């Protein structure tokens, strides 16, 4: 009875506090962006129907391109137009270079010390320097080209097993995820986790890590109400904080194991971990174990799911538009032919394929809300005052479908990128100081895979119906239904893989 009374009194006083806070918000924060009326304690959380990018777009159509919402006690501003986005990351770029402090940053991203979770400052500049020089420089990306070539060719061989004489049905979704995971893991540690030549224990280890990532994404952003409502953090009926902490502990065991395994080897190789461990010997203050594990985690989170879903969406579009498939195939055959396989050096010539990828990124942006930003100081957005410590979300999905920015905004039209200036409107990788540093690596891997798939196989849909392009809700926008298709090998497969 005592505990019940305590909870009742706590709820009562917290309710009074939030009601008073709500009444004084309009006085404290003048000239905020418009938005729907918020409720005590929960703010606008009751407005957040899934998926969020579509909900925000609907609210934008009612209140304007810059809107404000209260996620519990935290103010959130959502930007949904290209002009305001560009204002944010030119004039206000430094002000918006911080990240919000969520539970995931504390327990999973090493107490806000990873590249994606840390706020702007000396530590971030150090991480960015390490990433630019030691992880994602052109030299390092070129060094890993044989890995990308090998993984894509393994995919081709696997698909060709049943399709050498006739069309065969193949499942592509999980193959893309396995391939991109192998790509990044081989860059990081030299290990393959999926394939016929892999040890079952390593497959289980990778599956456990993927499950951790899946649970992490489910508990990120608006899904974790304790990040926005102090009362829930205090009560924590759903054990959300404990769950996030447990994920962080499991994640650290996995990454620490990778470092220990590389350290135990007699000879260092060309992997990312080995290179960073070599740097640790001469500059231990910059290349700590925590920083190395954080960089590995950033590569795995940013370089696997996003690339895999982009491959899936792009192949779905290619299959839904036979004329697009024909143009891509003709381009590959013209510049490469059927006597050898596509190489990364051929990619600059495949401009129509590039357009197809960008058009897919436009309509099916892998991270529809990008990564959240936080204001380091008060600033002006779209003529409105935005206070310090406001969470800022960019609805890239809505911006990419804005009819004021794009002609035939919802139509799949790759040739639009032949027009000068269109590519500058793309924001799938962000903009400014906190733009994604892995854009070059991602586009190389995606382009290489798609070029080989079109060069090596004839493709068609399983039936006459178009592939369902519905999306699943989540931080990463995946297809609702896994992608399946029919393929049959072309002559180059027999010539190269005798």
From Swiss-Prot:
Principal location listed in the UniProt entry: endoplasmic reticulum
Uppermost EC category: oxidoreductase
Keyword Heme: yes
Record keywords, A-Z: Endoplasmic reticulum, Heme, Iron, Membrane, Metal-binding, Monooxygenase, Oxidoreductase, Transmembrane, Transmembrane helix
Ranges annotated as spanning the membrane: 3-23
Keyword Membrane tagged: yes
InterPro entries listed in its UniProt record: Cyt_P450, Cyt_P450_CS, Cyt_P450_E_grp-I, Cyt_P450_sf, Plant_Cytochrome_P450_Monoox
Reactions the enzyme catalyzes: formononetin + reduced [NADPH--hemoprotein reductase] + O2 = 2'-hydroxyformononetin + oxidized [NADPH--hemoprotein reductase] + H2O + H(+)
PROSITE patterns for the chain: CYTOCHROME_P450
Expressing tissues: Expressed constitutively in roots, but present at very low levels in uninfected stems and leaves.
Topology with respect to the bilayer: Single-pass membrane protein
EC number assigned by the record: 1.14.14.89
Pfam families in UniProt: p450 (PF00067)
Record note on pH: Optimum pH is 8.0.
Induction: Down-regulated in roots by drought Up-regulated in leaves upon infection with fungus. No regulation by methyl jasmonate or elicitor treatment.
This protein's GO CC annotations: endoplasmic reticulum membrane; membrane
Residues annotated as binding heme: 436
Requisite cofactors: heme
Subcellular localization(s) per the UniProt record: Endoplasmic reticulum membrane
One of the record's GO molecular function terms: oxidoreductase activity, acting on paired donors, with incorporation or reduction of molecular oxygen, NAD(P)H as one donor, and incorporation of one atom of oxygen
Family classification: Belongs to the cytochrome P450 family.
Function statement: Involved in the biosynthesis of the pterocarpin phytoalexins. Acts on isoflavones with a 4'-methoxy group on the B-ring, such as formononetin and biochanin A, and on pseudobaptigenin. Has a low activity with daidzein and genistein and no activity with the 7-O-methylated isoflavonoids isoformononetin and prunetin.
Protein name from the UniProt record: Isoflavone 2'-hydroxylase
Organism for this UniProt entry: Medicago truncatula
Encoding gene, per UniProt annotation: CYP81E7
